[in-house]
Amino acid sequence: NVNGIRACLTKGFKDFFDSIDADFFCIQETKMQEDQIDLTINSILEDYNQYWNSAEKKGYSGTAIFCKEKPLNVTYGLGIEEHDNEGRIITLEYDKFYLVNCYTPNSKRELERLDYRQVWEDEVRKYLKRLEESKPVIYCGDLNVAHKEIDLKNPKTNHFSAGFTDEEREKMTELLNEGFIDTYRYLYPEKEEAYTWWSYMRQAREKNIGWRIDYFIVSGSIKDKIEDAKIHSDILGSDHCPIELDITL
């Protein structure tokens, strides 16, 4: 989650982008319309195919995938009108897998979007299961939930906070119960203080008072193909840090 891609590009993201040389970059919260793509972005992405799904509301939400190999097919959204005006999902289809990049809606303060979030989660889970009927799925992005107490610094004081409510955590449990794998916890089940998001308040990042709310989740059928899952907490430029999945398919 870049929290605005144009601002992030000036804060070290380009150096990270160049150094890691990934096959895919999945970006959330681009805050950008496709007609705003300029020469700066295109020069950075010259070796990549670009796929953007922007929100109807300018400067809000949005997702993008940059990939070296062209997909067989690209799908924007879930195909459900009420869920598809905020640019939150892009799916790329390849011979051996689907890649789904997602920016899950935040339940917000006072949990004003929690009811909507619950409906969203159910529809996404059904969508992923439908895809999985034909080939394995890699599902990634800012999923806006810390699943277990180990996934945030202060669980006791956040039980009613957006991102750690019982309802949101239960939806993640339901997804994993369908056979999907949280790749980071699959490899590092006991690793503490492994976070991907920090508030801008109270020097949270410097003190590592964070949450793990960004994920790579894969179909159980390809869990043995996972080589590593990494959190790049040293990369600045957003309130989130990049995460990485190394997998051979």
What role is predicted for each listed range?
Residues N1, F17-Q36, L99, L128-E149, ...:
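Active-site beta-strand/loop signature of hydrolases that rely on acidic residues for catalysis
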